[in-house]
């Protein structure tokens, strides 16, 4: 269908949706919608590659991502409930216990997330069960698994956070490069599943 340009007010009583249609299959995916209840949803605005199943497969685990462009600033958010994810030993990757599923929490790309300039991690619920000393690394590989040493990857420590406590905010001392994957890692040793813990990672970038 050709482009259509309207001048003046466009009105729709039942809401509005913008869709994308997959080439070949014709499958339609909602990119953006505004419901008749005044609820706006930007469905397509998330990481191009979200967390591996070594994160999303946890029992009780919640993972969501968001990418929003406001003017010249691109904000990437990753929200995680750690429930069901295993902590093991210092320097190891956090994820679902006893699996070989990849445990990154998403990939940063210049096309989607821009060039990252700064980052922070906020704790909305202190981790319990597992160890609360949780750090964030990036790595060029997306193959890291639970209980694997982050040092076995080509990695960079983004923040040495110390123990996460309710309301704690830590600022990244390094930022991920384009195409790198993010990982949650342990800064201490407690070999157990998390029974609580809510973290929000926010990365701020720009289009170079």
Enumerate the predicted regions with their spans.
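Short, intrinsically disordered N-terminal pre-domain segments
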Residues: 1-19, 66-72, 207-208
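Fibrous stalk/shaft segments of extracellular and virion attachment machinery
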Residues: 22-64
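Extracellular receptor-binding modules and their adjoining Ser/Thr/Gly/Asp/Asn-rich linkers
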Residues: 61-97
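Beta-strand-rich interaction surfaces with strong enrichment in secreted/lumenal proteins
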Residues: 90-94, 105-108, 170-174
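Beta-rich globular "head" domains
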Residues: 98-138, 200-206
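Terminal beta-strand-rich extracellular "head" domains
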Residues: 126-177
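Noncatalytic modules at the cell exterior or secretory-pathway interfaces
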Residues: 172-193, 197
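Ser/Thr/Pro-rich, low-complexity mucin-like regions
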Residues: 192-194, 205-208
């Amino acid at each position: 269908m050709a482009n259509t340009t309207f001048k003046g007010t466009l009105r729709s009583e039942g809401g509005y949706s913008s869709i994308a249609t997959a080439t070949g299959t014709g499958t339609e995916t909602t990119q953006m919608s505004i419901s008749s209840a005044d609820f706006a949803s930007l469905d397509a605005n998330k990481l191009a590659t979200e967390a591996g199943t070594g994160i999303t497969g946890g029992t009780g685990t919640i993972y969501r991502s968001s990418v929003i462009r406001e003017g010249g600033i691109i904000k990437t958010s990753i929200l995680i409930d750690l429930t069901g994810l295993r902590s093991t030993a210092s320097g190891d990757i956090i994820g679902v216990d006893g699996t070989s599923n990849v445990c990154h929490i998403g990939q940063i790309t210049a096309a989607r997330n821009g060039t990252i300039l700064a980052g922070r991690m906020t704790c909305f619920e202190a981790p319990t069960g597992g160890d609360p000393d949780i750090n964030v690394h990036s790595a060029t590989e997306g193959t890291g698994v639970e209980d694997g040493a982050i040092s076995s990857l080509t990695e960079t420590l983004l923040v040495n956070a110390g123990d996460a406590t309710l309301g704690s905010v830590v600022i990244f001392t390094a930022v991920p490069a384009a195409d790198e994957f993010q990982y949650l890692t342990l800064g201490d040793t407690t070999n157990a599943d998390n029974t609580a813990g809510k973290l929000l990672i926010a990365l701020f970038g720009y289009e170079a």
